[in-house]
Design a protein with these regions (language model features):
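Class I S-adenosyl-L-methionine
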Residues: 1-18, 164-197
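SAM-dependent Rossmann-like transferase core, predominantly class I methyltransferases
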Residues: 1-56
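Conserved SAM/SAH cofactor-binding pocket of Class I
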Residues: 39-127
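Conserved SAM-binding loop
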Residues: 82, 161, 182
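Short beta->alpha hinge that forms the Motif I/post-I loop of the SAM-binding pocket
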Residues: 84-88, 141, 164-165
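A short SAM/SAH-binding and catalytic strip from SAM-dependent methyltransferases
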Residues: 124-136
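A short glycine-rich, Lys/Arg-flanked "PGG" loop and its adjoining helix->strand segment in the class I
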Residues: 142-155
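Conserved beta-strand signature within the Rossmann-like core of class I S-adenosyl-L-methionine
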Residues: 156-162
Length: 197
């Protein structure tokens, strides 16, 4: 057995920070995408100006909080919840909110889906659903998140989702949430808006 002490002056490599188009991301440890703005989130955010103005919004599976921070900056009247089950993600998201000056309007919670959120409490849910669990590819996570979103949305509320186009989530979104329209599509991703009936 061999143990070493930290190298003097090496410092803790976490958290890391990066700025993308004026949006500061802060990442701790294993938060998805780290300080990068993943391509799905980047594509969803190109439609930020078309998203409804919500008083109560949720960033479901928030990761480092990029979507919540961007929405909060664009919509100062909104109050948001940023939710993720990962401790690294929620710690990162809290710091991202502080770095972007929106911490007083975005409550970051560690939750499995939206289990702690009341029914009918949101006007808008924003989602970039994971399709990996560890190293395994899975399509089982997204439908559960769609159901959580449907439960917390008020009638007429919207779920905006970005997803890898090959996953073809639209029929599930129609069945679980409600009428779904395509907002945009590129070579890899689709953005949809589903209205809770």
């Amino acid at each position: 057995l061999h143990a070493e002490v930290p190298v003097p002056g090496a410092g803790d490599p976490w958290p890391r920070r990066a700025v993308h188009d004026g949006l500061t991301l802060v990442a701790h440890g294993a938060a998805f995408a780290g300080t990068d703005l993943d391509v799905g989130t980047r594509f969803l955010l190109t439609f930020l100006d078309r998203m409804p103005r919500a008083r109560a919004a949720i960033d479901l599976g928030c990761g480092t909080g990029a979507i919540a921070a961007a929405y909060a900056r664009a919509h100062p009247e909104a109050r948001l919840v940023a939710s993720d089950r990962s401790a690294a993600a929620t710690t990162s998201a809290e710091q991202t909110m502080i770095a972007n000056g929106v911490a007083e309007r975005v409550r970051v919670v560690r939750d499995d889906g939206l289990g702690s959120q009341p029914d009918g409490s949101a006007d808008l849910v924003l989602l970039n659903p994971p399709f990996h669990s560890g190293n395994a590819v899975t399509e089982e996570i997204a439908p559960r998140l769609f159901a959580d979103a449907a439960r917390v949305l008020r009638p007429g509320g919207e779920l905006w989702t970005v997803w890898n186009s090959h996953l073809r989530y639209r029929p599930q979104l129609e069945r679980i949430v409600g009428t779904t329209r395509q907002i945009g599509r590129n070579a890899s991703f689709t953005v949809t808006a589903s209205v809770r009936g």
